[in-house]
């Protein structure tokens, strides 16, 4: 006969912390070069103009400007940064 009982509930009650994914800067929001715009797993959104992609598919701004979300085609989303020349 086993002399330990009730172990299942204590061994199974674990979970990993959330990964804090998602959009960090929203449409028409001002960003500086290097700001993270979207954290994602895989390319749910693709980089557009003035946006770079890291090795973990993070999208970030390459220049200062305003974020714009648009569709590349019917199914694929694209994120761009519209740079603004302030009185130059």
From Swiss-Prot:
Keywords attached to this entry: Ribonucleoprotein, Ribosomal protein
Pfam families linked to this entry: Ribosomal_L27
Domain of life, per lineage: Bacteria
Tagged with keyword Ribonucleoprotein: yes
InterPro entries: Ribosomal_bL27 (IPR001684), Ribosomal_bL27_CS (IPR018261)
BP GO annotations: translation
GO cellular component terms given for this protein: cytosolic large ribosomal subunit
GO molecular function, one term: structural constituent of ribosome
Region Disordered: start-end pairs: 1-21
Family indicated by similarity: Belongs to the bacterial ribosomal protein bL27 family.
Protein name listed in UniProt: Large ribosomal subunit protein bL27
Originating organism: Helicobacter acinonychis (strain Sheeba)
């Amino acid at each position: 006969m086993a002399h330990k009982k009730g172990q299942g509930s204590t061994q199974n009650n674990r979970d990993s912390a959330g990964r804090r994914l998602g959009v960090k800067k929203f449409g028409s929001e001002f960003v500086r070069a290097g700001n993270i715009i979207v954290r994602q797993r895989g390319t749910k959104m693709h980089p557009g103009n003035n946006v770079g992609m890291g090795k973990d598919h993070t999208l970030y701004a390459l220049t200062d400007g305003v974020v714009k979300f648009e569709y590349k085609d019917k199914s694929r989303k694209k994120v761009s940064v519209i740079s603004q020349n302030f009185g130059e």
